[in-house]
Swiss-Prot record:
Biological source species: Pseudechis porphyriacus (Red-bellied black snake)
Function: Bird-specific neurotoxin (tested on chicken) that acts as a pseudo-irreversible antagonist at the nicotinic acetylcholine receptor (nAChR) of the skeletal neuromuscular junction. Has no significant effect on the electrically-induced twitches of the rat isolated phrenic nerve-diaphragm preparation.
Cellular compartments per GO CC: extracellular region
Signal peptide location: 1-21
Domain of life: Eukaryota
Primary location: secreted
Name of a matching Pfam family: Toxin_cobra-type
Keywords assigned: Acetylcholine receptor inhibiting toxin, Disulfide bond, Ion channel impairing toxin, Neurotoxin, Postsynaptic neurotoxin, Secreted, Signal, Toxin
Location relative to the cell: Secreted
SUPFAM superfamilies from the UniProt entry: Snake toxin-like (SSF57302)
Protein name: Alpha-elapitoxin-Ppr1
InterPro entries tied to this protein: Snake_3FTx (IPR003571), Snake_toxin-like_sf (IPR045860), Snake_toxin_con_site (IPR018354), Toxin_cobra-type (IPR054131)
Length: 83
């Protein structure tokens, strides 16, 4: 019985790839590159760009948020793909 339970746990870990976390860039505008480890369950990164009175602005992070009209949004699904 213990062997069966252990086998099921191992199969679950292998099939679900537990422990993998997405890494996304999170620097703002033209700042030096920085990264963050996303929360469990996040599987995408984003890059938002827009212009305001300060010029062109860029925001990066985990997930794929909804944006207002006039903001360019790029979402991707590999580590550090939003640089």
């Amino acid at each position: 019985m213990k062997t069966l339970l252990l086998t099921l746990v191992v199969v679950t870990i292998v099939c679900l790839d537990l422990g993998y976390t997405m890494t996304c860039c999170n620097q703002q505008s033209s700042q030096p590159k920085t990264t963050t480890t996303c929360a469990g369950g996040e599987s995408s990164c984003y890059k938002k760009t827009w212009s305001d009175h300060r010029g062109s602005r860029t925001e990066r992070g985990c997930g794929c948020p909804h944006v207002k009209p006039g903001i360019k949004l790029t979402c991707c699904e590999t580590d550090e793909c939003n640089n």
